[in-house]
Amino acid sequence: MPQQGLAYPVPTLIYHITHLNNLQGILQRGGLLPYSQRPPTQQNVAYGHIQAHRAQVVVPVGPRGKLHDYVPFYFCPRSPMLYAIHTQQTDYQGDQRPILHLVSSAQKVAEARIPFVFTDRHAAVQYVCFFHKLEHLKALDWQAIQASYWANVREKKQAEFLVKDFFPWELVEEIGVIDKTIQAQVESILAQFPDLHHPPVRVRRSWYYKKRLCSASCEATF
């Protein structure tokens, strides 16, 4: 497993989570919008109070701006955010089943010359470090990012890759879903847009939580 300061996976996969109900709108717009441009009809799965704080966080490098000017991705599936959804800790009161993982890579974004930054931990904490060159991916704690048990490394596991203003749909390489029923629903929505890029839709059960093995304060389950 890559270690902090030594190596990082190439391609460096990035994962955006969204609700199934948002997929049609994403396809109609041809991509993902940042929170500041989010349509009021979009199904929100986030913490409201954290989003209010993120709206004020300044990005000090690269294209700058604020966090809400960027489309957020994690460097791993099965994130702490998904656990919060799974255990109904966010403003969204559904479960993880309709949550999709939209997968791309940091290299694809860079090759498309789309402005981006990334962080070494959760982007909204005070002591976060921001970067805007891929060579600095080695500064991230990849052992924490890839950890199955992350109660003690929660902030570093939530390192973010942030794409400025708009993320084009054609850069999505895969859609990961929890089961075949959701897979069929995603395929049905994609079929309504025959002229658009159709990434493979794959059942990735290991990207989702199976059951709670501990209290919400532990937040580390298989």
Curated annotation (Swiss-Prot):
Gene name for this UniProt entry: darT
Effect in UniProt of substituting Q158A: Still toxic in vivo, decreased DNA ADP-ribosylation activity
Organism: Thermus aquaticus (strain ATCC BAA-2747 / Y51MC23)
Protein family (similarity comment): Belongs to the DarT ADP-ribosyltransferase family.
Pfam families: DarT
Job of this protein: Toxic component of the hybrid type II/IV toxin-antitoxin (TA) system DarTG, which plays a crucial role in controlling bacterial growth and bacteriophage infection. Its toxic effect is neutralized by cognate antitoxin DarG. In case of phage infection, DarT toxin ADP-ribosylates DNA, which inhibits both viral DNA and RNA synthesis and leads to abortive infection. ADP-ribosylates ssDNA on the second thymidine of the consensus sequence 5'-TNTC-3'; the protein does not auto-modify. Has no activity on dsDNA in vitro. This leads to a decrease in DNA replication.
Lineage, top ranks: Bacteria, Thermotogati, Deinococcota, Deinococci, Thermales
Keywords associated with the record: DNA-binding, Glycosyltransferase, Nucleotidyltransferase, Toxin-antitoxin system, Transferase
Chain positions recorded as NAD(+) binding sites: H16, I17, T18, G25, L33, R54
Catalytic activity annotation: a thymidine in DNA + NAD(+) = an N-(ADP-alpha-D-ribosyl)-thymidine in DNA + nicotinamide + H(+)
Its EC number(s): 2.4.2.-
Annotated protein name in UniProt: DNA ADP-ribosyl transferase
Leader sequence residues: none
Domain DarT: start-end pairs: 12-209
UniProt xrefs under PROSITE patterns: DART
InterPro entries: DarT
Oligomer status and interactors: Interacts with cognate antitoxin DarG (via C-terminus); this heterodimeric complex neutralizes the toxic effect of DarT by preventing ssDNA binding to DarT and consequently inactivating the toxin by direct protein-protein interactions.
